[in-house]
Regions:
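ATP-driven catalytic headpiece of P-type ATPases
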Residues: 93, 312, 433-440, 446-479, ...
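Conserved ATP-binding TGD loop and adjacent catalytic N/P-domain core of P-type ATPases
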Residues: 16, 435, 516-518, 550-552, ...
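Conserved catalytic phosphorylation-site environment of P-type ATPases
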Residues: 293, 352, 387, 400-474, ...
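Flexible metal-binding regulatory segments at protein termini and peripheral loops
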Residues: 1-129, 154, 227, 252-253, ...
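Transmembrane helix-loop-helix hairpins at the membrane interface
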Residues: 90-244, 355, 721-726, 732
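Juxtamembrane coupling segments of multi-pass membrane pumps/enzymes
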Residues: 185-189, 194-195, 210-271, 302, ...
């Protein structure tokens, strides 16, 4: 997606006009314009020059983002222009100048005429002089705020009226009619028609013309200031980017601008300094605070070979590192780019506002014209009718309509970024909260992904220390993942590391054997150990209990005699069960996917508290499982992104967990920087809060216009005598956008990890707790076309216990989902009876 800056937009009608113009350019497949950030994202093959030309033809300005930069200098972190709030100071100066001239204008028009406040002697009883003074002061205020007239009438000429058009028409009509009344009063005074003079004097609306412009400027300043607050999170990320780095060149330390750092350069970081770019530690060790990227305040220990990231703080030791990712490739720059891209996209709910915005301003102008005509036909004066029409123009607010969605999206996205939760698009931020089913990959998501020693059970006559020492010595030469758990425990317990076994041998799928000081040590699974040692029934039952708890029992023997069991398991993370409880509190069904056998899977599922366990799922079968789950509701798939890409893509929402510094996971819609499952309910909670905020903003905007426009038009005058002065209409318009933005800023106070106010969503159906299903993948030869697929699918799904079958003749596979145990022979016979050959079932 190419990014562009867009200038000249003032309301939702403007952004809709730009979007419509760019979508007509040949080669553009998608265009999204953000009124909040004055930016535009365009996808397709169209040339930037053609896109810019289309925007300019529509009456606005455009430029390609980052076009002036190249190479490493094009880092998103270096976008200083974005950090500067240039809009608010300009509006403030315009407002101060307007107030300087509005004050005497209001004094003359309201103070003297209504309350008899004193005026200079030459103006006493000189109504023409009073009128001319008001005219001159109004002209000055209009010149100061000429931006409204230039943009407003330019939009009108291009057939795209906007908020500025409404302001310009309202203020211009007030000024035009007042000028007419002034000249008519002058003629009356020359003719000594004092009744005419007094009548026309009360038809002056100069103060309304100036006050409308000033009040709208007040609203614009409040809006600009508040909009600046919505991007605080993104600005904070940009400010984290280091400006310089200390490189080692020819043995000397040289400080250089960050743009000059290249991949492979060696840099040094002292305690208290920020790490300039992503790299690998070559020398030294330290504790690094990564809260800037992950939101985790606890420092992470870094040693030789560990990765470090730009903008993180080196808290303790001196480290020498090699640069691995610089410029736009650093983790920080990717995060900034992701947040920026999300801000440039539109949530589906924004389409409601877009559709309304396209016709809103023309409709308001039409309503104002009809209002004036009706009141004139009803016998009211031109001044009265015009006041009602002007009130309609200035109270209507398309700007608030355009800001209702993007400000909430920006604040919500920023809140997520500060807490290590990255939403890739506005659509993903909106959709996450609608999740009904969460599918969790077991390894690395529910569990730590690293086996840990859970039980050390020595045989009679052997103590724990002796068992651990012998097991540690034997496992030292093993490359099996389970061996690492025992080695880690041995190191923690201070086991003698000098002992070495001889004649070491590893038996695949069985165990290990070796000699130590003339004795034979053996270790492995039950089947392997029974070949060399006797295992009693009591020990067998003990191992079965361990297996039922999701643990893997490893047996050890010395000279053919069992010396004990050490149980190893991929233990669930500390926050996993709490996260599942929080998801349940939201009314979300939780499903666990794993390739483990049913017994182990059910044990882990029980510990985590999930609703359903789907065991025996191979990596390629996860996508099929997600496809079936989607028939039951909106599905979010949570995985580590390594072998979960198809499932993450297939799900309504793909969530990659534990990405750490590697956030470039294309398959995911949401990236969680920390390996913390509790961030999943937090992301859903934040999404729901953001969507609720958008609904509040849209309701307020529509409610405001539905109530305000009839009031301004004078609908209630015949019944209650209620009428709205154009000045109060302008004040209401100026405050409406401010209220919308301020409401969005309330999201900054939202506590995304607080489950106290969670509400359950309506589920499609009740599901039985701990329902267990399995999948089997069949390799089938002989399928040639879609007809073959349909035949095999129908055959398999006719078997009792088969819930679904996903068949592919191209891959030569059938992924079968089972709700009950079905023997492989039954599946094989059913398929082969249809003249296909089954070569394997897993």
């Amino acid at each position: 997606m190419k990014q562009y800056n867009v200038t000249g937009m003032s309301c939702a009608a403007c952004s809709a006009r730009v979007e419509k113009a760019v979508n007509k350019v040949p080669g553009v497949t998608a265009c999204s314009v953000s009124l909040l950030t004055n930016s535009m994202g365009v996808e397709g093959t169209a040339e930037p020059s053609a896109i810019i030309a289309a925007v300019e033809t529509a009456g606005y300005g455009a430029s390609e983002k980052g076009a002036e930069n190249s190479g490493a200098k094009a880092s998103a972190a270096a976008d200083d222009d974005f950090l500067k709030d240039t809009e608010t100071p300009k509006i403030r100066r315009r407002l101060i100048a307007s107030l300087v001239f509005l004050t005497p204008l209001m004094y003359l028009s309201m103070g003297h005429m209504m309350w008899g406040w004193p005026v200079p002697g030459f103006m006493v009883d000189n109504h023409v002089a009073m009128g001319l003074a008001q005219l001159l002061l109004t002209v000055i205020v209009m010149v100061i705020n000429q931006k409204f007239f230039i943009n407003g009438f330019k939009g009108l000429i291009h057939g795209a009226p906007n908020m500025d058009t409404l302001v310009a028409l309202g203020s211009g009509a007030s000024f035009g009619y007042s000028t007419y009344a002034l000249f008519a009063m002058t003629v009356a005074q020359v003719n000594m028609d004092m009744d005419g003079v007094m009548a026309y004097m009360h038809e002056f609306y100069f103060e309304s013309a100036a006050m409308i412009l000033t009040l709208i400027t007040v609203g614009k300043m409040l809006e600009a200031h508040s909009k600046g607050k919505t991007t605080d999170a993104l600005k904070g990320l940009m400010k984290l980017a280091p400006k310089t780095a200390v490189l080692v060149r020819d043995g000397a330390e040289v400080e250089v601008p960050i743009g000059q750092v290249r991949k492979g350069d060696v840099f040094v970081v002292r305690p208290g300094e920020n790490i300039p770019v992503d790299g690998i530690v070559l020398e030294g060790n330290s504790a690094v605070n990564e809260s800037a990227l992950t939101g985790e305040s606890i420092p992470v220990d870094k040693n030789v070979g560990d990765a470090v990231s730009a903008a993180t703080l080196n808290q303790s030791g001196f480290i020498r590192c090699e640069a691995t990712r610089v410029g736009e490739d650093t983790t920080l720059s990717q995060i900034i780019q992701m947040v920026s891209d999300a801000a440039a996209t539109k949530a589906p709910i924004a389409k409601i506002a877009d559709r309304v915005s396209g016709v809103f301003v023309p409709a308001v102008i039409s309503i104002a014209a009809v209002t004036i005509i009706i009141w004139l036909l009803a016998g009211q004066s031109v001044g009265f009718a015009l006041a009602r029409g002007i009130s309609v123009l200035v109270i209507s607010c398309p700007c608030a309509l355009g800001l209702a969605t993007p400000v909430a999206i920006m604040v919500g996205n920023g809140m997520g970024a500060k807490n290590g939760i990255m939403f890739k698009t506005a659509a993903s931020l909106e959709a996450t909260g609608k999740t009904q089913i969460v599918a969790l990959d077991k390894t690395g998501t529910i569990t730590s992904g690293e086996p840990k020693t859970t039980d050390i059970l020595p045989a009679e006559g052997i103590d724990e220390a002796e068992l651990l020492k012998l097991a540690y010595t034997l496992e030292k030469k093993s490359e099996h993942p389970l061996a690492r758990a025992i080695l880690e425990t041995g190191k923690e317990c201070g086991v003698d590391d000098t002992l070495e076994v001889a004649d070491f041998q590893a038996v695949p799928g069985g165990g290990l054997t070796g000699k130590l000081d003339g004795t034979v040590l053996t270790g492995g699974n039950l089947k392997y150990i029974t070949e060399t040692a006797e295992v009693s029934d009591a020990v067998r039952k003990q191992s079965e209990r361990l297996a039922e708890d999701g643990k893997t029992p490893l047996f050890f023997a010395k000279d053919g005699k069992l010396i004990g069991i050490i149980a190893v398991a991929d233990v669930i993370k500390e926050d996993s069960s709490q996260a599942v409880r929080e998801l349940h509190g939201m009314g979300i069904r939780v499903v666990m996917l794993t390739g483990d056998n049913e017994r182990t899977a059910k044990a882990i599922g029980h510990q985590a508290g999930v609703d359903e366990v789907i065991a025996g799922v191979l990596p390629e079968g996860k996508e099929s499982v997600i496809r079936n789950l989607k028939k039951k509701g909106k599905v979010a798939m949570v995985g580590d992104g390594i072998n979960d890409a198809p499932a993450l893509t297939r799900a309504d929402m793909g969530i990659a967990i534990g990405a750490g510094t590697d956030i470039a996971i294309d398959a995911a819609d949401v990236v969680l920087m920390k390996s913390r499952l509790s961030d999943v309910p937090a992301a859903i909670r934040l999404s729901r809060a953001t969507l609720r905020n958008i609904h509040e903003n849209l309701f307020w905007t529509f409610f405001y216009n539905v109530i305000g426009i009839p009031l301004a038009a004078g609908v209630w005058i015949p019944l209650f005598g209620w009428k709205l002065n154009p000045m109060f209409g302008a004040a209401a318009m100026s405050l409406s956008s401010f209220c919308v933005v301020t409401n969005a800023l309330r999201l900054n106070l939202f506590k995304m990890h607080d489950a106290g106010k969670d509400k359950k969503i309506k589920a499609k159906a009740d599901h039985k707790k701990e329902e267990t299903t399995m999948t089997k993948t069949m390799k089938i030869e002989g399928m040639m076309c879609g007809h073959c697929e349909a035949t095999v699918k129908k055959t398999l799904e006719a078997i009792a216990g088969v819930e679904a079958a996903e068949v592919s003749h191209e891959a030569g596979t059938a992924v079968v989902t089972l709700t009950a145990e079905v023997a492989d022979d039954v599946l094989k016979k059913a398929v082969e009876d249809k003249d296909y050959k089954v070569t394997d079932i897993q």
